[in-house]
């Protein structure tokens, strides 16, 4: 079926001509200022009727130039399918919507170049401020942005960059989970599968893991520490490489994200090793939680982030910025889910 080409959009000048008024008068009416300038009701009705008939919409960017605000917030996250980021974005979008703000979300795919492109496109749309989960630790690019547009950081933050952020307080919970798992299961080895070490959450989670081993009195073997990125395929491949090196499964694994856990479970399923979880020959723990873990026939202890509280804290920063109030960073506590 042929798709009909849309009709040419009517201009403000054409509406004014059809209504028999000046372009200035038509602009005042269509921007909701007709009554303020005491334009007669019948004139306002005539202009509005013509605009509606032709599907005319006032230029939001032109209005924003006058108001010095667009009421649009730009947000760049690394993975739209990631449960944590998706949950936070969903709550934040509703909070913005309820206050008359539009949250526009873009994805970086955890790629610095894609992050830059997404930011540039949002800046082209004159967003009032940016919320980003940076894919790198280099402050130079952001130093250029903040000269003109304010930036808040979510989940991750760049050191030596004076930006307010909202992150999870992950290190204490990870340390407690690791220490208690070692003690309860009598572990002599414990592998760590993490994402890019250049990212602030990766460093925090690794430090929490190491702290937990110290608390449990288990000496760290550097061969236990593995890093790639946070995609499920990386969890799969890291476990495959570990098994190839050891010739067996390790005693225990901590995955630094639920996405990495997905990859680990896929490896175990494809290699018919899920029974090792049931027999207790393999112990899995993870950062990030999902309700699905409650339905499994084996135990996977997890650490849940409070995505609603994270979104609320971030929205609080947005509101404070719009009110020109002082901004402060927030760390939101995590919760351990024992199973």
Placement of each model-derived feature along the sequence:
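N-terminal helix-turn-helix DNA-binding module of bacterial transcription factors
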Residues: 1-69
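Short beta-strand segments enriched in small/hydrophobic residues
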Residues: 23-28, 65-79, 189-196
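Short, solvent-exposed amphipathic alpha-helices that sit
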Residues: 84-98, 173-177, 200-219, 234, ...
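Structural motif
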Residues: 104-124, 175-176, 224-246
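Flexible loop/hinge segments that line or gate small-molecule binding clefts
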Residues: 132-173, 178, 198, 259, ...
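Hydrophobic alpha-helical segments within soluble ligand-binding/sensing domains
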Residues: 164-192, 207-211, 232-240, 261, ...
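An alpha-beta-alpha
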Residues: 176-218, 222-223, 328-339
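Flexible loop/turn connectors
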Residues: 244-339
């Amino acid at each position: 079926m042929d798709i009909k080409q849309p009709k040419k959009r009517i201009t403000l000048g054409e509406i004014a001509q059809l209504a028999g008024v000046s372009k200035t008068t038509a602009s005042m009416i269509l921007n909701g200022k007709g009554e303020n300038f005491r334009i007669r009701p019948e004139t306002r009705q005539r202009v509005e009727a013509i605009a509606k008939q032709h599907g005319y919409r006032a230029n939001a960017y032109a209005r924003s130039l006058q108001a010095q605000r667009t009421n649009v917030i730009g947000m760049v996250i690394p993975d739209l399918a990631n449960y944590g980021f998706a949950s936070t974005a969903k709550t934040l979008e509703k909070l913005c919507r309820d206050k008359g703000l539009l949250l526009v979300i873009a994805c970086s795919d955890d790629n610095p170049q894609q992050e830059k492109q997404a930011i540039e496109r949002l800046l082209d749309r004159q967003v009032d401020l940016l919320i980003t989960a940076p894919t790198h630790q280099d402050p130079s690019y952001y130093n250029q942005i903040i000269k003109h547009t304010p930036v808040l950081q979510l989940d991750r933050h760049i050191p030596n960059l004076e930006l307010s952020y909202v992150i999870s307080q992950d290190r204490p919970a990870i340390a407690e989970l690791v220490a208690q798992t070692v003690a309860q299961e009598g572990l002599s080895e414990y592998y760590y599968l993490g994402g890019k070490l250049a990212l602030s959450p990766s460093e925090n989670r690794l430090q929490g893991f190491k702290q937990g081993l110290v608390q449990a009195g288990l000496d760290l073997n550097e061969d236990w520490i593995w890093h790639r990125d946070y995609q499920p395929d990386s969890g799969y491949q890291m476990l495959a490489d570990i098994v190839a090196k050891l010739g067996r499964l390790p005693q225990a694994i901590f995955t630094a994200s639920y996405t990495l856990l997905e990859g680990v479970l896929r490896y175990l399923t494809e290699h018919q090793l899920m029974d090792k979880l049931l027999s207790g020959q393999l112990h899995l723990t993870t950062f990030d939680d999902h309700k699905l873990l409650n339905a499994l026939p084996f135990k996977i202890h997890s650490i849940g982030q409070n995505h609603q509280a994270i979104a609320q804290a971030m929205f609080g920063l947005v509101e404070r910025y719009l009110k020109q109030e002082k901004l402060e960073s927030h760390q939101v506590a995590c919760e351990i889910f024992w199973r």
